[in-house]
């Protein structure tokens, strides 16, 4: 089958398959002196430039409180010199309307140079700066269409703050101008979940409670909080991972097929699925959610400190670095099927996978092989690293007698296509510039996820002794209580 470019085989650089941006544009990055800009945004734009996707006329304007000139700004990045010629910098006080008037003058000069008012404002700043920036963009008229605004997680700290942020956003920008970015939705392997489900009838027919026993989603990191202690102390892992990445992956695995893959149809089904998740019973929360915090331990052969010993972390901090939970989706497709989710820092390895575990056979016809000893069929989506899909099934062992053995049939992107997968930010920045909202979150996306998790957060805050996190040694798969969460149901976490 040929792609949109008429190619039967992907080029070595899959970015060359992406649509070229024809219209000139400008992108203004607030927080341009920060880590996200250096690690992700500028490298992604540079890759789009080198792949020939960006138009001849465009500009990248960095804006931050740090004082520096264009030359110093450009020197921060390892990028194509021709790309860097399109980059400039202005120092901005986010709280000062006069500073935004100077910003507007600079933008107007750049707009004349490219002959286009197609503008993107990217807020790569802490969440407490969102509202003053949005207000000052409005005061200077920079919020008018066709301008678009991109905001990063966390989208608020709870339901109330998320609604305040959304009220401000929608006071100054219309919904089709707002792009709430969750970079996990930009990953090629995450999007492949949809193709696997909805382009293969054989799998979609068994994707329900008649055949599926349970689903496991694991997002593990071997690193600690690193230089993000200040941020993490105010957020914690439930807000940082579950409110966005984890629930979005869950939605892709469990949602109903949209009538077409366009922005609204796709997002409607995603939200519908999230609304079907059963609320957690706060009075028996310990039976549904396990909270953990890493202690001292050994990761990858190296001794590492406990979370409370990390620079910038309070010595008596109760912030969680690990969460495991069980939840149910109350709809026809998934009624009765438990979903087990876990994520944590300082675990043995970095891996993100989704495992759809099917029911065991009802009866074994093989002598000496009880049905409960036969491992069930499992479909595994490995989202990172070594991205791919595996199907685990039983085969006959090559020996006398009928002895089944579990094997895995593996597809790996790199092995089959032999191409470099685009970074999530490359895809998502392209979509923002083109105005395609499909892979971005809507307001109701955010609110329904906060409605689910808000009671949990409030319970933790109201009774810190009862819900104090269990300490687990760094380099292990979390506290023992996380194992008990799934073992009480007669199941076990997959060995990763």
Swiss-Prot record:
Name the cystine pairs.
none
The UniProt entry's sequence similarity note says: Belongs to the glucose-6-phosphate dehydrogenase family.
EC code: 1.1.1.49
Keyword Disulfide bond on entry: no
Q: Which HAMAP family match?
A: G6PD (MF_00966)
NCBIfam families for the chain: zwf (TIGR00871)
> Which classification does the entry list for the species?
Bacteria, Thermotogati, Thermotogota, Thermotogae, Thermotogales
For whether the record's keyword set contains Oxidoreductase, the answer is yes
* Function in brief: Catalyzes the oxidation of glucose 6-phosphate to 6-phosphogluconolactone.
User: What's a GO cellular component annotated to this UniProt protein?
Assistant: cytosol
Record keywords, A-Z:
Carbohydrate metabolism, Glucose metabolism, NADP, Oxidoreductase
Gene Ontology terms: biological process: glucose metabolic process; pentose-phosphate shunt, oxidative branch
Name of the protein this chain belongs to? Glucose-6-phosphate 1-dehydrogenase
Species assigned in the record: Thermotoga maritima (strain ATCC 43589 / DSM 3109 / JCM 10099 / NBRC 100826 / MSB8)
List residues binding NADP(+).
31-38, 65, 153
Active site (record annotation): 245 (proton acceptor)
What GO annotations for molecular function exist for this entry? Answer: glucose-6-phosphate dehydrogenase activity; NADP binding
